[in-house]
UniProtKB/Swiss-Prot annotation:
Organism of provenance: Acidovorax ebreus (strain TPSY)
GO biological process: D-serine catabolic process; isoleucine biosynthetic process
Gene name for this UniProt entry: dsdA
Keyword Lyase: yes
Protein name: Probable D-serine dehydratase
Family annotation (InterPro entries): D_Ser_am_lyase, Ser/Thr_Dehydratase, TrpB-like_PALP, TrpB-like_PALP_sf
Recorded GO MF terms: D-serine ammonia-lyase activity; hydro-lyase activity; pyridoxal phosphate binding
Cofactor: pyridoxal 5'-phosphate
Biological classification of the source: Bacteria, Pseudomonadati, Pseudomonadota, Betaproteobacteria, Burkholderiales
Superkingdom of origin organism: Bacteria
Enzyme Commission numbers on file: 4.3.1.18
A Pfam family that the UniProt record links to this protein: PALP
Gene3D superfamilies named in the record: 3.40.50.1100
Length: 451
């Protein structure tokens, strides 16, 4: 079982530093988590609250009739972009769980329509917020407009307004797909700056939808910086900043409201006797931070969120260990930032996301690429679900908590061990719907070869 590190202060001892530098799977537990979250959380010089999450959800609802008309795949849901909650008892062993340690579920964002990943949440929300703002400015909508009025934003007059503007983003893949597809569908000129580790099929999918793809030889951080700089020169360009955007973060947070209803519909309680553990793959941190913020706001002390990262790209763990006032890169730790989990190949975390998570996050853990491929196959064989390697990252989480001495010690210290049999473990799968069959076949072949 992977070794576990639990630093108790900002000054890290030699053991976790050595484990990170050796790219060994490890667990970090957050000593600054507050059981009761503040109603208003500080982030990036501002404050956000549950009201902001509800406003993001309301924006999705206002746009649902328009989205239903623009995207055929949303006709069955009335324009709602959501994913199912799936029982996964057949994956207990793969997740490191034994009898009496709780029930395993999957939040299947790998099935999300339009973008095929978790990025459909934040990315599409920011595009919709921009479209709404421009529509109000140009008289296409009024503050009194209802959801049916939003259908008019697909008309030629609205598209002519949107066509004057460029929506740009820097991405390793999935956020680019989300932003590019949504912006292009509404009539914006969409530009996606993609890092060297972005998959070719994702570039092709964007180009097929009329999105301009700018390829960069460097990593995610370089692609974002290039996109940000280019957009800054054009007053009609809106840059979706994955490292800094609150609109993205709040779009992700809206998932918590729907998940709360799904849990209730499934008869799953979340309280002191029925804790909820959520395991979220993490790249720069905006998506899992947004979801964690929303979950902590709606479910309080009894939800414990953990971020999963590749051993060569643990940017969020590195940032949380360093604390505020520092902004380390994985390169500073002698790591390569090279991983087949392209959506998680990020060298430096989002500072706003890290600031927001300091009192909310329970911990982070890292996984090897080989583990991702093995678990991708285990998910396929047990459930029939097809996910990307990065989407498998959360499946290692339960084993870190229940299968290691430090994990069990933490569960005891938090008063969670006596209630473990009634716990729910929720693995958030983040992408996979649009992976081409030939690419998935290579994933599966590698996973089966590993045994």
């Amino acid at each position: 079982m992977p070794s576990v590190v639990s630093p108790q202060d900002r000054l890290q001892d030699d053991a976790p530093a050595a484990q990170l530098r050796r790219a060994e799977p490890c667990l970090w537990l957050n000593p600054h988590r507050q059981p009761i979250p503040a109603a208003r959380q500080a982030v990036a010089g501002d404050h956000i609250s549950l009201d902001d999450t509800k406003e993001a959800a309301a924006r999705f609802a206002r746009f649902a009739p328009l989205l239903e008309g623009v995207f055929p795949e949303l006709q069955a849901t009335g324009g709602v972009i959501e994913s199912p909650l799936l029982p996964a008892s057949s994956l207990h062993a793969a997740a490191g769980l034994v009898a009496g340690q709780g029930a395993l579920w999957i939040k299947a964002d790998h099935r999300l329509p339009v973008a095929g990943s978790i990025k459909a949440r934040g990315g599409i929300h920011e595009v919709l917020e921009l479209a709404e703002r421009l529509a109000l400015q140009h008289g296409l909508l009024t503050p009194q407009s209802d959801a049916d009025d939003y259908r008019a934003l697909a008309n030629p007059a609205a598209r002519a307004v949107f066509a004057r503007y460029t929506v740009a983003v820097g991405s390793t893949g999935n956020l680019g797909l989300s932003i590019g597809v949504a912006a292009s569908a509404l009539g914006f000129h969409a530009v996606v700056h993609m890092s060297a580790d972005a998959k070719e099929w994702k570039k092709q999918r964007l180009r097929q939808r009329g999105v301009q793809v700018v390829e960069h030889a460097g990593d995610y951080e370089g692609a974002v910086a290039a996109g940000r700089a280019q957009a800054a020169q054009d007053p009609f360009s809106h840059f979706v900043d994955d490292e800094r955007s609150l609109s993205l973060l709040l779009g992700y947070s809206a998932a918590a409201l729907h998940l709360r209803q799904q849990l209730q519909d499934a008869g799953i309680a979340v309280d002191a006797q029925h804790p909820l553990f959520v395991y979220l793959p993490c790249g720069v941190g905006g998506a899992p931070a947004g979801i964690t913020f929303g979950l902590r706001q709606v479910l309080g002390a009894h939800v414990h969120c953990f971020f999963a990262e590749p051993v060569q790209s643990p940017c969020f763990m590195v940032q949380m260990m360093a604390g505020q006032g520092a902004h380390p890169s994985v390169y500073d730790w002698g790591l390569t930032n090279r991983t087949e989990a392209d959506g998680l190949a990020v060298p430096r975390a989002s500072l706003p996301a890290a600031e927001l998570m300091e009192p909310l996050l329970s911990g982070c853990f890292t996984v090897c690429d080989d583990t991702l491929f093995r678990q991708l196959v285990q998910v396929l064989d047990a459930t029939g679900e097809r996910i990307e390697p990065s989407a498998a990252a959360g499946l290692s989480g339960p084993g870190f908590l229940t299968g290691t001495e430090t994990g069990r010690t933490w569960l005891h210290a938090q008063g969670l061990w006596p209630h473990l049999a009634q716990a729910t473990h929720l693995v958030w799968t983040t992408g996979g719907l649009y992976v081409p069959p030939e690419a998935y076949a290579r994933f599966e072949e590698r996973g089966r070869a590993l045994g």
